Amino acid sequence: MTVPTPAAATTPTLHRAWAADLDPATLYALLALRTAIFVVEQECPYQELDGRDLEPRTRHHWLADGGTVVATLRLLADPGGVLRIGRVCTRADARGRGLGHRLMDSVLAEVGDRPCVLDAQEVQEPFYARHGFVPAGERFVEDGIPHVPMERRRS
């Protein structure tokens, strides 16, 4: 008999918080998940922390299942009033359950009609296209991974 892991046991709960309102344990869990995905899983031995997680206008969104963070993203305020979605990731054992789409729906409800951009890993371009994002610039390679800048067009 297989015992379900927390990531497969229940429907995760959606959370969001401004950087200043995050308790240290939650911030640690968000950063640990991102490091597990972007540094370890994707084999990118580059600095994951960029200083933007604690900016006053940074909003973190995450899904927790049984107290375990299973997916996260952050919303940044770039110069000129443009919002930027980034660091979107889901635990490997929680993928295929639509959690990334839940996070995107949550953050885009907050964004509303304001301009919004992101830099997608090329393999994730169709995922973001489902949320109204289109390519918006020259493709580039970051940390050895091809990326495409994307923007959301207002409806």
Protein language model features and the residues they cover:
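Short acidic/glycine-enriched loop/turn segments that link adjacent beta-strands
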Residues: 55, 79-81, 142-146
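Conserved beta-strand in the GNAT
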Residues: 62, 68-77, 82-89
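Conserved acetyl-CoA-binding loop-helix of GNAT-fold acetyltransferases
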Residues: 90, 96-109
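Conserved GNAT acetyl-CoA-binding A-motif
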Residues: 104, 109-122
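C-terminal binding/interaction regions
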Residues: 150
